[in-house]
């Protein structure tokens, strides 16, 4: 039985009908208790989010890393709430069973807990996000507490915090030497404030493992060794979509960039040669 033209979407493929459990925060807690590790990826649009859900990724982060990989900024600092909200909408639609977390951009939460609440509320109401992420440890505990009390789940982010790249003096490992005590204090502070999980970025593996064992909430590593409860990567780095040098903690699991470049070149060549579209692609 063939599908009629009216039933075939003009662009992209139809959404597959695959019943799947909606990922919720209690599931992540249970996975930690059971010693079951899980993967998180960034996502910035409907199509990639759909693929990641089909691949079994339970948590998707609409990260402020969109500043780099979507908008082409040099750092994450310039991106705004208005630039991120449309991306969140697409991801939520593309991955209806994933837990979708939205990053609070630089300058939208540091000033006060009320400022954080205003920004987070926009992501929940206008974007459809299920949770928000913000950077910082003890210094943002008040913000985390207010958001949690208001019914907004919070994923914390400690260690290297990209929004503070100018203060930190570049991309540097955090938590070495005397910094270990502060990182542990930050981890405990965000847990006590009500965060449901915490990202640890560019932290020595041994220290990250120590924090993971100390906390009752899941830890998510990026450049923090193998002992975290979960791992996260920017999807373009993970899939080999970006070119050039990547961070030490990145492993490329594909070569999407080369494949896409080759596909685009082949398409352009067939158009120039007049071989596309052929009879099979014409009405």
Curated annotation (Swiss-Prot):
Record: active site: 201
Localisation per UniProt entry: Cytoplasm
InterPro entries, per database record: Pantoate_hydroxy_MeTrfase, Pyrv/PenolPyrv_kinase-like_dom, Pyrv_kinase-like_dom_sf
Chief subcellular location: cytoplasm
Pathway connected to this protein: Cofactor biosynthesis; (R)-pantothenate biosynthesis; (R)-pantoate from 3-methyl-2-oxobutanoate: step 1/2
Sequence positions that bind Mg(2+): 64, 103, 135
Function field: Catalyzes the reversible reaction in which hydroxymethyl group from 5,10-methylenetetrahydrofolate is transferred onto alpha-ketoisovalerate to form ketopantoate.
Quaternary structure annotation from Swiss-Prot or TrEMBL: Homodecamer; pentamer of dimers.
Record protein name field: 3-methyl-2-oxobutanoate hydroxymethyltransferase
Lineage: Bacteria, Bacillati, Actinomycetota, Actinomycetes, Mycobacteriales
């Amino acid at each position: 039985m063939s599908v009629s033209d009216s039933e075939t979407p003009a662009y992209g493929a139809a959404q597959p009908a695959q019943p799947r459990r909606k990922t919720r925060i209690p599931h992540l807690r249970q996975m930690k208790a059971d010693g079951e590790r899980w993967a998180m990826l960034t996502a910035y649009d409907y199509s990639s989010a759909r693929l990641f859900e089909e691949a079994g990724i339970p948590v998707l982060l609409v990260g402020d890393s969109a500043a780099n990989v979507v908008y082409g900024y040099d750092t994450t600092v310039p991106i705004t709430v208005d630039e991120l909200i449309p991306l969140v909408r697409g991801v939520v639609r593309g991955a209806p069973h994933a837990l979708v977390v939205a990053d609070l951009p630089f300058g939208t939460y540091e000033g006060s807990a009320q400022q954080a609440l205003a920004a987070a509320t926009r992501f929940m109401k206008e974007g459809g996000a299920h949770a928000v992420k913000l950077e910082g440890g003890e210094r943002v505990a008040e913000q985390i507490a207010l958001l949690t009390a208001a019914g907004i789940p919070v994923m914390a982010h400690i260690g290297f915090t990209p929004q503070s790249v100018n203060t930190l003096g570049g991309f540097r490992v955090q938590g070495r030497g005397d910094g270990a005590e502060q990182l542990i204090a930050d981890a405990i502070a965000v847990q006590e404030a009500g965060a449901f999980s915490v990202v640890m970025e560019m932290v020595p593996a041994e220290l990250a493992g120590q924090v993971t064992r100390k906390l009752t909430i899941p830890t998510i590593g990026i450049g923090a060794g193998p002992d975290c409860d979960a791992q996260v990567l920017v999807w373009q780095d993970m899939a080999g979509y970006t070119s050039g040098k990547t961070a030490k903690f990145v492993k490329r699991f594909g070569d999407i960039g080369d494949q896409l470049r080759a596909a685009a070149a082949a398409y352009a060549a067939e158009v120039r040669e007049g071989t596309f579209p052929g009879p099979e692609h014409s009405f």
